[in-house]
Amino acid sequence: MKLQDEIVRRVQAALPDAVIELRDLTGGGDHWQAVIVSAGFEGKLPVARQRLVFGALGELMHGPIHALTLKTLTPQQAQESGR
């Protein structure tokens, strides 16, 4: 399974309604940027949202993923920002 597919699979396992935009920033598969929209972020501070995502990725954060930039939004925030 490609790393991109595994990232999406794991995030959606933790946040089943998640809509994920994922971009490989370097082409090498180790630096990623993700925009994740989920109702599961409702009522959570940004750091709690990030912990949820990093927790879902588990050991991938200690191996193939060297860096991950996150933007985590609720559906309302996504709508307000035009996403």
Language-model segments: residues:
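N-terminal first-folded block
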Residues: 1-29
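A short interface-forming secondary-structure element
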Residues: 33-48
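C-terminal structural segments of small proteins and small subunits
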Residues: 50, 54-83
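Short loop/turn motifs enriched for small/polar and acidic residues
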Residues: 25, 37, 71-75
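Hydrophobic aliphatic residue packing
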Residues: 7, 20, 36-37, 53
